[in-house]
């Protein structure tokens, strides 16, 4: 980018661009204010402002003078270049015209029929001044005209080539003909010889044949020699052609290299031009700065001079400084007056020199003017006393003579025409009278016809009026009916618009439900994870609470009720497990049946029902698993109580391990369930997409019906789900009550087992070493525990083992049944999804089948249409062939006509060439006369310009002289005169009506200038006339004026 564009751009754009490019912002130009100094009155302030303005104007004038000098120098350079270009163009035009003339002469020499009207026209145009044509043409016209001229020259060259080709063909034909004649002559000679042998009687005929054969032989030899020479020349030309082709190839390669170099140089040239532009712009800036600095320097020097004149030089001796202030001030005033006088004297001397120079120029101009007047008078005398021979020899006299003869002949022809027209007028008058009589008779007949037609039209009008009345009545009836039906139509329109809005809202709700579905799926995953963590923590809390309660109740209960409570607890736990498993299976079966019924009832709302079924099943399976986990420690405790071999710590460790395993199994099961749900959700999403596509393909009425049905089904399904949830809540309450009873029984069993274990420990501690309880007191009986080592204890233990095994078998059976139920549910879900997919695929296939059938029908119709088009095209082809044959015949006729026109064009071209020569002579004479007139007019204009300039200077000198006379007469100084002039100027600038304010408004009617307030007050007070010329004006006739 050059610096001009950056400087010309606005401040805001520059700052933005600089901030975007990371460059510092461009500094703003600040103009220093001019200090006027202390001012006492408005007149002094105006004088100082005017002085400053005059200085600025002087600076601008100097700059303008410099720019004018530079531009003049540039104009001179451009004029020189233009003259050179004009000379080159003239040379090119001259040689181009000469080439066209030579080509035309060659064409006329070879074949007179090859000339063209366009070429003659172009030649006629070319003979006129080429530069004048170039100046009149635009860019587009110039390109077109020059291209046409180039095409003309190309055509001429092509015609020369055609002529040469024709000559070559003609020569070849001649050679072929001559060869054929020679062969025929040879054959005739051999036949004549045979006839001479057979008929030896005709000796004279033999002599003739021998002489003719000798002549033919000589011709053949000459033709052979010429043919050999032509062939050798042809070989030479071919060799030359090949060598020229080689040279052309090499030259073209060099040309390409030079072109590449040229393009590189052009790019360098463009870069250098840009640099030159930038440097020129910098140079202009520097010149402006230099001018400003020079002006500032000049002002500073003037101020220094004035300061030195007022206060004296500081370098002078101190004696001069010791002089009194009064003498210094008086000297300063005298020095100022002396300087002003010296400046005025210098100006007077300069004006005197200018006046002397102008006087000398005026004397010279007067002398030349007198000489020119003498020459003009001589020429006038010569023109008045011209001899007859000169007049007769002039071309103008000859032209007038020829025009007179032509006009005389025309006048004679016009006389004859007049006589003929008079005769025709008389005949036409007679015919006109006859026609008038005929017209009158026809008018009477037409009037009768019009009257009869008017009567008929009146009858028709009466019929039309009757029809109009009937139609009007029908129209009023229709209008009444329309007024009745109009509100119904409006209601229907409102209904349609409301339904359309409802459809749009439903579409938005569908998108919102999709988003909600995604959010609920993510929330579902999070809730499941939280549920698994909560279950794990609950199980741990329950186990801790159970162990703490068992430890407190051991001391309160006796060991006698252990067996009975254990047996009761075992039976109760078995029954609860069975009931729980039965309830779980029943719930799962019910849910499965419910899901299958809903899927069979409604295919469209299958996705939501399946998801709800999956959630319910997961909850039920989770409850069953939790119940199994809670019930599973029962048999382990019974076996431990029976064996009495494993301690409490080992049992706690084993319980913690089982808990960890159960938690991991729950987590793995939840992960698997979530993955399965994810797959099912994706399948449901695909199915919903298919349903959406199907929904889009259906019409609006069907969509509305489907939406209503779907909303009804959704509401019904929601009601059924709420009912199921109520049932499940009731069942869950029952199960929780049962679970609480089972947990209390298990706690009691654990408490009793722990009491039994502690009692056994106490028994072991209290047992003596010699196993004799009454050794200390003989005669006393030993106290023994009942059922120790008895059959009843063994039977109880066996029963306990059997019940534990039965409980384990029941648990295994329950788990197997749950797994089978899950597998069945998965299979049912898969079958249902496959069924939905199959139904959708069936629908899609049906639609594809219908689409393909439609395509087949359209294809068959297109094929039939193409067959019809083919037949039509064949018919058109036949008709076109017939038209082509007729056009060929017309072409033959037109070619013959063209040849005739070409011959006529050649004749007209010859006549045009003769006329061209005469025109050239006349143009040369005209140019000479124009040059003479232009020289004289330029000299006269220069004299007039000089006289005007002298008059202006004289007027200026007169003004200055009058000013000086006034000063001498009044005895005032220059300052007073200047003040008077300033006062006069101020008076001219003040408003003439109020004589207070400045002129700042102009009337567009009379162009008198006043202040804006005066004109506005005049307009408001209805005095709407100009104060000077009483010209009326309006609101739009006075405008603001800004004088500087």
UniProtKB/Swiss-Prot annotation:
Identify the keywords attached in UniProt to this record, alphabetized: Chromatin regulator, Coiled coil, Metal-binding, Notch signaling pathway, Nucleus, Phosphoprotein, Transferase, Ubl conjugation pathway, Zinc, Zinc-finger
Q: Which SMART domains match?
A: RING
Record-listed Phosphoserine modification sites: 243, 632, 638
| Database matches in SUPFAM superfamilies | RING/U-box
Subcellular localization is given as: Nucleus
- For bias type Basic and acidic residues, the affected ranges are 552-566, 615-632, 649-664
Which pathway is this protein assigned to?
Answer: Protein modification; protein ubiquitination
Q: Tell me if Coiled coil is a UniProt keyword of this record.
A: yes
Example of a GO biological process term: proteasome-mediated ubiquitin-dependent protein catabolic process
Q: Which reaction does it catalyse?
A: S-ubiquitinyl-[E2 ubiquitin-conjugating enzyme]-L-cysteine + [acceptor protein]-L-lysine = [E2 ubiquitin-conjugating enzyme]-L-cysteine + N(6)-ubiquitinyl-[acceptor protein]-L-lysine
Q: Where is this region: Disordered?
A: 182-214, 312-335, 546-586, 615-664
User: Which intervals hold the zinc fingers (RING-type)?
Assistant: 991-1030
Cross-referenced InterPro entries: E3_ubiquit_lig_Bre1 (IPR013956), Znf_C3HC4_RING-type (IPR018957), Znf_RING (IPR001841), Znf_RING/FYVE/PHD (IPR013083), Znf_RING_CS (IPR017907)
Compositional bias of kind Low complexity:
320-335
Instruction: Spell out which residues are annotated as carrying Phosphothreonine.
Output: 242
What are the recorded GO MF terms, alphabetically? ubiquitin protein ligase activity; zinc ion binding
The answer to whether keyword Metal-binding applies is yes
Composition-biased stretches, type Polar residues, lie in 567-586, 635-647
PROSITE patterns documented for this protein: ZF_RING_1, ZF_RING_2
Q: What is its EC number?
A: 2.3.2.27
The record ties this protein, via Pfam families, to: zf-C3HC4 (PF00097)
| Protein purpose | E3 ubiquitin-protein ligase that mediates monoubiquitination of 'Lys-117' of histone H2B. H2B 'Lys-117' ubiquitination gives a specific tag for epigenetic transcriptional activation and is also prerequisite for histone H3 'Lys-4' and 'Lys-79' methylation. It thereby plays a central role in histone code and gene regulation. Required for the expression of Notch target genes in development by affecting the levels of Su(H) in imaginal disk cells and stimulating the Su(H)-mediated transcription of Notch-specific genes.
Q: Of which family is this protein a member?
A: Belongs to the BRE1 family.
Q: What is this protein called?
A: E3 ubiquitin-protein ligase Bre1
Q: Which organism is it from?
A: Drosophila melanogaster (Fruit fly)
């Amino acid at each position: 980018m050059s610096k001009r564009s950056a400087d010309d751009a606005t401040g805001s754009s520059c700052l933005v661009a600089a901030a975007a490019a990371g460059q510092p912002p461009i500094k703003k130009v600040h103009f220093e204010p001019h200090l006027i100094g202390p001012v006492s009155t408005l007149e002094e302030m105006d004088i100082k402002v005017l002085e400053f303005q005059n200085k600025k104007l002087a600076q601008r004038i100097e700059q303008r003078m410099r720019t004018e000098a530079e531009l003049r120098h540039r104009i001179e350079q451009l004029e020189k270049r233009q003259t050179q270009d004009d000379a080159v163009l003239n040379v090119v035009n001259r040689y181009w015209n000469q080439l066209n003339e030579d080509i035309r002469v060659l064409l006329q020499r070879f074949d007179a029929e090859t000339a063209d009207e366009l070429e003659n026209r172009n030649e006629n145009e070319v003979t006129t001044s080429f530069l004048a044509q170039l100046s009149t043409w635009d860019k587009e016209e110039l390109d077109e005209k020059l291209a046409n001229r180039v095409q003309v020259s190309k055509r001429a060259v092509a015609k020369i080539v055609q002529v040469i080709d024709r000559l070559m063909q003609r020569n070849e034909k001649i050679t072929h003909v001559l060869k054929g004649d020679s062969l025929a002559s040879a054959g005739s000679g051999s036949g004549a010889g045979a006839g001479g042998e057979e008929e030896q009687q005709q000796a004279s005929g033999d002599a003739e044949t021998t002489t003719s054969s000798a002549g033919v032989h000589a011709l053949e030899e000459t033709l052979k020699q010429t043919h050999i020479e032509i062939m050798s020349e042809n070989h030479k030309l071919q060799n030359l052609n090949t060598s020229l082709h080689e040279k052309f190839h090499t030259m073209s390669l060099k040309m390409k290299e030079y072109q590449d170099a040229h393009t590189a140089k052009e790019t360098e040239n463009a870069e250098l031009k840009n640099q030159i532009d930038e440097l020129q712009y910098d140079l202009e800036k520097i010149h402006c700065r230099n001018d400003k600095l020079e002006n500032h320097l000049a002002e500073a020097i003037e101020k220094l001079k004035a300061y030195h004149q007022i206060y004296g030089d500081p370098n002078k001796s101190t004696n001069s400084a010791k002089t009194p202030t009064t003498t210094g001030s008086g000297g300063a005033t005298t020095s100022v007056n002396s300087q002003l006088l010296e400046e005025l004297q210098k100006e007077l001397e300069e004006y005197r020199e200018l006046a002397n120079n102008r006087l000398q120029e005026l004397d010279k101009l007067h002398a030349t003017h007198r000489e020119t007047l003498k020459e003009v008078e001589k020429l006038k005398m010569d023109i008045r006393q011209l001899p007859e021979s000169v007049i007769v020899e002039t071309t103008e006299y000859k032209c007038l003579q020829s025009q007179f003869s032509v006009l005389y002949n025309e006048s004679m022809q016009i006389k004859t025409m007049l006589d003929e027209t008079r005769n025709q007028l008389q005949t036409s008058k007679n015919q006109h009278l006859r026609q008038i009589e005929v017209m009158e008779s026809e008018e009477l007949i037409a009037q009768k016809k019009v009257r009869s037609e008017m009567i008929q039209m009146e009858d028709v009008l009466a019929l039309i009026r009757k029809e109009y009345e009937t139609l009007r009545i029908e129209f009023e009836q229709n209008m009444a009916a329309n007024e009745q039906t109009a509100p119904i139509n409006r209601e229907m329109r409102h209904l349609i618009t409301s339904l359309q809005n409802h459809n749009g809202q439903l579409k938005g709700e569908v998108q919102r439900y999709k988003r909600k579905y995604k959010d609920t799926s993510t929330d579902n995953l999070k809730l499941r994870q939280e549920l698994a963590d909560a279950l794990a923590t609950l199980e741990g809390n329950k186990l801790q609470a159970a162990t703490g309660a068992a430890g407190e109740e051991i001391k309160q209960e006796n060991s006698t009720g252990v067996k009975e409570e254990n047996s009761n607890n075992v039976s109760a736990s078995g029954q609860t497990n069975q009931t729980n498993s039965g309830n779980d299976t029943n719930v799962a079966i019910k849910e499965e049946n419910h899901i299958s019924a809903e899927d069979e009832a409604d295919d469209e709302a299958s996705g939501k029902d399946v998801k709800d079924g999956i959630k319910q099943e997961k909850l039920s399976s989770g409850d069953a698993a939790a119940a199994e986990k809670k019930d599973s420690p029962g048999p382990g405790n019974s076996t431990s109580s029976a064996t009495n071999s494993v301690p409490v710590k080992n049992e706690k460790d084993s319980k913690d391990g089982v808990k960890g395993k159960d938690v991991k199994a729950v987590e793995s099961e939840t992960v698997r369930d979530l993955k399965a749900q994810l797959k099912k959700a994706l399948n449901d999403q695909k199915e919903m997409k298919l349903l959406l596509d199907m929904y889009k393909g259906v019409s609006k009425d069907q969509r509305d019906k489907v939406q209503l049905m779907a909303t009804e089904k959704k509401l019904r399904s929601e009601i059924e789900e709420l009912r199921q949830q109520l049932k499940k809540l009731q069942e869950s309450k029952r199960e929780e009550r049962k679970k609480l009873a089972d947990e209390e029984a298990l706690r009691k069993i654990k408490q009793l087992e722990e009491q039994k274990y502690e009692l056994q420990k106490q028994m072991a501690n209290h047992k003596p070493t010699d196993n004799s309880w009454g050794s200390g007191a003989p005669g006393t009986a030993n106290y023994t525990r009942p059922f120790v080592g008895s059959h009843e204890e063994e039977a109880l233990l066996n029963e306990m083992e059997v019940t534990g095994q039965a409980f384990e078998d029941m648990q295994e059976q329950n788990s197997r049944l749950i797994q089978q139920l899950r597998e069945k549910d998965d299979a049912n879900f898969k079958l249902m999804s496959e069924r939905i997919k199959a139904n959708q695929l069936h629908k899609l296939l049906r639609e594809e089948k219908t689409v393909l059938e439609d395509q087949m029908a359209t294809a068959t119709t297109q094929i039939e249409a193409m067959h019809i088009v083919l037949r039509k095209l064949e018919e058109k082809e036949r008709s076109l062939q017939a038209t082509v044959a007729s056009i060929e015949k017309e072409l033959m006729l037109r070619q013959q006509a063209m040849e005739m026109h070409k011959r006529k064009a050649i004749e007209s071209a010859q006549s045009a060439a003769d006329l061209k020569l005469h025109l050239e002579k006349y143009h040369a004479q005209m140019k000479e006369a124009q040059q003479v007139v232009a020289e004289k007019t330029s000299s006269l204009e220069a004299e007039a310009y000089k006289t005007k300039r002298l008059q202006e200077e004289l007027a200026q000198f007169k003004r200055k002289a009058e000013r000086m006379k006034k000063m001498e007469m009044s005895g005032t100084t220059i300052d007073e005169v200047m003040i008077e002039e300033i006062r006069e100027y101020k008076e001219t600038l003040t408003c003439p009506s109020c004589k207070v304010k400045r002129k700042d408004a102009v009337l567009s009617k009379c162009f008198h200038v006043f202040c804006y307030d005066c004109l506005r007050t005049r307009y408001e007070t209805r005095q709407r006339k100009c104060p000077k010329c009483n010209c009326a004006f309006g609101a739009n006739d006075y405008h603001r004026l800004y004088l500087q």
